[in-house]
Amino acid sequence: MQVITDQKLYDRIWDKIFQEYSFSTQNEKWLCPDTEYAVYRFGSLWDERQDAIVNQILCRIAGAEMYALDWQHDCFLFNPNENIPFAYQYYDTARDCTVYFPTYYPNGDYHFFISKDWSTGLFGHPWRSELIVTGAALMQAISDAADDLNLEKLETAQ
């Protein structure tokens, strides 16, 4: 896991989210992926168990490097196989701040987890308690685990 400190890379990632996914914090339709996706509603807050289920799915489906994006906070390049602890944080002495790795549940902010090749992703909305899933294999895996994750499927769209 590493914090994305390269401002140009950070900006390119968020520019792609805004331009290609039509991300907006102001609109009813807050994210519009240009590929097939499924929308779920969270039935409850996720704990360490649900976070681990999602991480196991990402290890299987996404494989190697992914982006972990926390709206207006640090963003990361990570590998799900690192098994980063639930609600992980550490003190970054170089930047003199505490760094928080986002949980898969969007606990207070938008949390996005996207494969580095942009083929699969989890996009969480904090106030609407929604999860948008992209990528056929990830969509199927989340669908299969929906009961354990306490997710209600709202729609599938293209």
Per-segment meaning from a language model:
Residues 1-158:
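Structured alpha/beta or helical-core interaction and ligand-binding surfaces enriched in interleaved
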